[in-house]
């Protein structure tokens, strides 16, 4: 029997005792603001405490957006004043590090834009699968004078190599499904019509296995592959410094004047849009 716990921006659904799905649902653009972080943190704590959970799939209910960038119209202090998490990191990077270390398997099902924070969640997950036609991944921050805060500078080089990581981060461009697969940014790019069934079958299969074996295999892979927390913390600190710089504020205002944070072309083609801002 399925049970569901709902909250306005993040929903947790249990398909099986061992298999859960987390749905991001903050229309129209699936922006990440302070309230999203608060709700996501509560769900992470619930999942960590559930000894039955073996696999969690992360997906979106908002057409066109897996999870988008931060909400630049929200008060920054509402985010920075959130308490540090159990890792000792600030609230957002704490969630991502806990997700990577959790004793269950995390899978990102990417349909639509995974921009900034959405890309950071995909990088924190154990696996990610993208819609060939509809997925777009982006670390867009440098294009507006920012440094990303959720750890992509620490994670991407280990995942796709230094040179490709620098291309993704410094171009601030959109990376579509097939190129993301070729770079190793995602596990696979699949036809959109096949994506849901593939991810569900994989999650159901993993959920049928022994949790001790799953958790210990993941723990040992983590020990061989994850960046230390100090690298994640350094990225967050650089992000917070970058937000207050005049250069970043000017570029963000210029984007807002063109339609940023509203449904439309600027958000749909954010990589192109930041490239039009000029020097």
Named regions from a protein language model:
Residues 1-59, 97, 278:
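Conserved CoA-thioester-binding segment of acyl-CoA-metabolizing enzymes
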Residues 1-17, 63-65, 172, 176-177, ...:
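C-terminal alpha-helix plus adjacent terminal tail
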Residues 60-95, 114, 145:
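Glycine- (often His-adjacent) and acidic-residue-rich active-site loop
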Residues 91-106:
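A structural motif corresponding to the C-terminal end of an alpha-helix
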Residues 95, 109, 115-169, 198, ...:
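CoA-thioester-processing core
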Residues 103, 125-126, 186:
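Short, well-ordered alpha-helix to beta-strand connector turns
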Residues 129-130, 186-198:
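Short acidic-hydrophobic, aromatic-tinged amphipathic segments that line or gate anion-handling sites
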């Amino acid at each position: 029997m399925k049970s569901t716990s709902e909250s306005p921006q993040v929903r947790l659904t249990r398909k099986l005792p061992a298999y859960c799905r987390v749905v991001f649902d903050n229309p129209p653009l699936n922006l990440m603001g302070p309230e999203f972080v608060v709700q996501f943190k509560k769900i992470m704590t619930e999942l960590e405490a559930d000894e039955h959970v073996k696999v969690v799939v992360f997906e979106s209910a908002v057409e066109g957006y897996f999870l988008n960038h931060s909400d630049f119209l929200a008060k920054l202090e509402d985010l920075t004043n959130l308490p540090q998490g159990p890792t000792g990191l600030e609230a957002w990077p704490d969630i991502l590090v806990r997700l990577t270390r959790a004793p269950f398997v995390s899978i990102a099902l990417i349909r639509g834009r995974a921009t900034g924070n959405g890309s950071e969640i995909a990088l924190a997950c154990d696996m990610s699968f993208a819609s060939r036609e509809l997925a777009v991944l982006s670390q867009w921050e440098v294009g507006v004078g920012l440094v990303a805060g959720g750890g992509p500078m620490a994670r991407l080089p280990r995942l796709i190599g230094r040179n490709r990581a620098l291309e993704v981060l410094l171009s601030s461009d959109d990376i579509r499904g097939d190129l993301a697969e070729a770079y190793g940014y995602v596990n696979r790019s699949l036809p959109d019509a096949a994506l849901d069934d593939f991810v569900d079958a994989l999650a159901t299969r993993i959920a049928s296995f022994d949790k001790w074996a799953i958790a210990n295999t993941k723990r040992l892979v983590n020990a061989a592959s994850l960046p230390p927390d100090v690298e994640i913390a350094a990225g967050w600190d650089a992000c917070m410094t970058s937000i207050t710089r005049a250069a970043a504020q000017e570029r963000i205002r210029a984007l807002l004047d063109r339609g940023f944070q509203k449904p439309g072309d600027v958000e749909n083609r954010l990589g192109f849009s930041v490239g039009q801002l000029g020097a």
